[in-house]
Amino acid sequence: MTVLHSVDFFPSGNASVAIEPRLPQADFPEHHHDFHEIVIVEHGTGIHVFNGQPYTITGGTVCFVRDHDRHLYEHTDNLCLTNVLYRSPDRFQFLAGLNQLLPQEQDGQYPSHWRVNHSVLQQVRQLVAQMEQQEEENDLPSTASREILFMQLLLLLRKSSLQENLENSASRLNLLLAWLEDHFADEVNWDAVADQFSLSLRTLHRQLKQKTGLTPQRYLNRLRLMKARHLLRHSEASVTDIAYRCGFSDSNHFSTLFRREFNWSPRDIRQGRDGFLQ
């Protein structure tokens, strides 16, 4: 597995923060690094496989990656993101207690992926741009300024994350996308889902298509197929059982959709013919 080292990304040995844009981010194999990062998705779509679990990412997705996490990008489509790198929560010169603002693992679950709305994303861009402008300065005032901006970024993300920001339809759509990540195997009635998140069905279709490039049902099918591919690689369950566990009532229909999406059959994936290294 590829290991990315801080010496290749931070401007100096005592720099606590670095900005690494990926405009665009192409498919990239599984890797980890000896630093932490906050991945901010500007626009486009892709699949982010984080510690073996696939997540669909779009504009407004924010991912918190620790130094022991492994991840990769695939099925990217005009995916543009900015990585805010930092060595460790306790490796800042002027800041302490940052862990309290970062996602915390509870009962083995790490809430790695957050979502923010478009207006917050604009504010995030401004903070990141200010950090980037000062990146080459190594004096103490510049270091302190960058760290203050980093703290402001964390505060903005925490205050604006889905759980606390439901005042407009874009935020409610983000919450709906997060809900689908947890309920992808359920039978989804789009009228009921639209009501649940206080969206009209027309608004749901329009905004989801704008955000992901897919219709709601196409998005749900892709999400189910990604989860199924993960189970094919990492479980001993039969193809039929996996199809049912991922929301498909007909295993033959599942196999047809799977091949159409990945150009491999479920059996091919199970046997590792796609070249994936487990």
From Swiss-Prot:
Annotated site residues (Interaction with sigma-70) in this chain: D241, D250
Subcellular localization: Cytoplasm
Cellular-component GO terms for this entry: cytoplasm
GO biological process: positive regulation of DNA-templated transcription; rhamnose metabolic process
DNA-binding region: 191-212, 239-262
SUPFAM superfamilies in the record: Homeodomain-like, Regulatory protein AraC
Database matches in Pfam families: AraC_binding, HTH_18
Domain HTH araC/xylS-type: residue ranges: 174-272
Main location: cytoplasm
Keywords: Activator, Cytoplasm, DNA-binding, Repeat, Rhamnose metabolism, Transcription, Transcription regulation
Quaternary organization: Binds DNA as a dimer.
Protein's UniProt name: HTH-type transcriptional activator RhaS
Lineage, highest ranks first: Bacteria, Pseudomonadati, Pseudomonadota, Gammaproteobacteria, Enterobacterales
